[in-house]
A protein has these predicted regions:
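Terminal targeting signals and extreme-terminal segments of soluble enzymes
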Residues: 1-126
Protein backbone atom coordinates (compact mmCIF):
# COMPACT_ATOMS: atom_id res chain seq x y z
CA UNK A 1 0.00 0.00 0.00
CA UNK A 2 1.37 3.41 -0.92
CA UNK A 3 1.75 6.14 1.68
CA UNK A 4 -0.95 8.22 0.00
CA UNK A 5 -3.41 5.32 0.22
CA UNK A 6 -2.67 4.90 3.93
CA UNK A 7 -3.27 8.61 4.51
CA UNK A 8 -6.78 8.44 3.05
CA UNK A 9 -7.92 5.49 5.16
CA UNK A 10 -10.87 6.61 7.31
CA UNK A 11 -9.41 5.14 10.51
CA UNK A 12 -6.39 7.44 10.21
CA UNK A 13 -8.31 10.61 9.42
CA UNK A 14 -8.50 13.01 12.37
CA UNK A 15 -12.11 13.12 13.54
CA UNK A 16 -14.11 16.13 12.36
CA UNK A 17 -16.79 15.30 14.93
CA UNK A 18 -16.38 14.65 18.62
CA UNK A 19 -17.72 11.48 20.20
CA UNK A 20 -20.50 13.54 21.76
CA UNK A 21 -21.37 15.08 18.35
CA UNK A 22 -21.84 11.59 16.92
CA UNK A 23 -23.86 10.39 19.90
CA UNK A 24 -26.13 13.45 19.72
CA UNK A 25 -26.67 12.90 15.99
CA UNK A 26 -27.97 9.42 16.68
CA UNK A 27 -30.10 10.52 19.62
CA UNK A 28 -31.69 13.41 17.69
CA UNK A 29 -32.48 11.55 14.48
CA UNK A 30 -36.16 11.46 13.64
CA UNK A 31 -35.73 9.05 10.72
CA UNK A 32 -34.36 5.97 12.45
CA UNK A 33 -34.44 3.00 10.05
CA UNK A 34 -37.43 0.69 10.50
CA UNK A 35 -35.16 -2.25 11.32
CA UNK A 36 -33.48 -0.27 14.09
CA UNK A 37 -36.88 0.71 15.46
CA UNK A 38 -38.03 -2.91 15.43
CA UNK A 39 -34.95 -3.96 17.40
CA UNK A 40 -35.40 -1.13 19.92
CA UNK A 41 -31.95 0.28 19.01
CA UNK A 42 -30.45 3.09 21.10
CA UNK A 43 -26.82 4.23 20.93
CA UNK A 44 -25.38 4.58 24.44
CA UNK A 45 -21.75 5.56 23.91
CA UNK A 46 -19.17 6.17 21.20
CA UNK A 47 -15.35 6.06 21.23
CA UNK A 48 -13.60 7.04 18.02
CA UNK A 49 -10.24 6.43 19.69
CA UNK A 50 -11.17 2.82 20.51
CA UNK A 51 -13.29 2.48 17.34
CA UNK A 52 -16.14 1.19 19.46
CA UNK A 53 -19.77 1.75 20.38
CA UNK A 54 -22.09 0.56 23.11
CA UNK A 55 -25.68 -0.05 22.10
CA UNK A 56 -28.93 -0.88 23.90
CA UNK A 57 -31.76 -2.90 22.41
CA UNK A 58 -35.24 -3.41 23.79
CA UNK A 59 -36.38 -6.86 22.68
CA UNK A 60 -40.15 -6.61 22.80
CA UNK A 61 -41.92 -9.91 23.37
CA UNK A 62 -44.75 -9.15 20.94
CA UNK A 63 -42.33 -8.66 18.04
CA UNK A 64 -39.06 -10.60 18.31
CA UNK A 65 -39.88 -13.97 19.88
CA UNK A 66 -40.01 -17.45 18.39
CA UNK A 67 -42.56 -20.09 19.52
CA UNK A 68 -40.22 -21.01 22.42
CA UNK A 69 -40.63 -17.44 23.80
CA UNK A 70 -36.97 -16.65 23.05
CA UNK A 71 -35.61 -13.99 20.72
CA UNK A 72 -35.49 -15.46 17.22
CA UNK A 73 -31.86 -15.92 16.12
CA UNK A 74 -32.23 -13.74 13.04
CA UNK A 75 -33.15 -10.78 15.23
CA UNK A 76 -30.11 -11.41 17.43
CA UNK A 77 -27.95 -11.42 14.29
CA UNK A 78 -29.56 -8.15 13.20
CA UNK A 79 -28.64 -6.65 16.59
CA UNK A 80 -25.04 -7.78 16.16
CA UNK A 81 -25.03 -6.33 12.64
CA UNK A 82 -26.24 -2.98 13.99
CA UNK A 83 -23.35 -2.95 16.50
CA UNK A 84 -20.84 -3.75 13.76
CA UNK A 85 -22.12 -1.24 11.23
CA UNK A 86 -22.35 1.65 13.70
CA UNK A 87 -18.83 0.87 14.98
CA UNK A 88 -17.57 1.11 11.38
CA UNK A 89 -19.33 4.44 10.90
CA UNK A 90 -17.75 5.75 14.10
CA UNK A 91 -14.29 4.43 13.17
CA UNK A 92 -14.51 6.36 9.90
CA UNK A 93 -15.55 9.60 11.59
CA UNK A 94 -19.03 9.18 10.10
CA UNK A 95 -17.70 9.32 6.53
CA UNK A 96 -18.17 5.67 5.53
CA UNK A 97 -20.76 2.93 5.82
CA UNK A 98 -19.64 -0.70 5.79
CA UNK A 99 -22.21 -3.17 4.45
CA UNK A 100 -22.04 -6.66 5.91
CA UNK A 101 -20.69 -9.05 3.29
CA UNK A 102 -20.34 -12.07 5.56
CA UNK A 103 -21.18 -12.76 9.18
CA UNK A 104 -20.79 -15.95 11.22
CA UNK A 105 -22.59 -16.25 14.52
CA UNK A 106 -22.49 -18.92 17.21
CA UNK A 107 -25.07 -18.80 19.97
CA UNK A 108 -24.00 -19.92 23.43
CA UNK A 109 -27.19 -18.94 25.26
CA UNK A 110 -30.73 -18.09 24.36
CA UNK A 111 -31.79 -14.47 24.11
CA UNK A 112 -34.75 -13.48 26.22
CA UNK A 113 -37.07 -10.47 25.83
CA UNK A 114 -36.22 -7.23 27.57
CA UNK A 115 -33.19 -4.98 27.68
CA UNK A 116 -30.05 -6.15 25.87
CA UNK A 117 -26.67 -4.48 25.53
CA UNK A 118 -24.25 -4.83 22.63
CA UNK A 119 -20.71 -3.63 21.98
CA UNK A 120 -19.24 -3.16 18.52
CA UNK A 121 -15.53 -2.63 17.97
CA UNK A 122 -13.50 -2.37 14.78
CA UNK A 123 -10.50 -4.66 15.21
CA UNK A 124 -9.01 -4.20 11.75
CA UNK A 125 -9.79 -1.61 9.10
CA UNK A 126 -9.10 -2.56 5.51
Amino acid sequence: MSDSAAETRPALTPPALTDDDILQRFLRTKNQPTGSQTLGFRLLSVSQENRSVEVAFEARAEVLLNPMKQIQGGYLCAMLDECMSVACMVASGMTHVAPTVEMKTSFFRRGMPGALRGVGRVVKWG
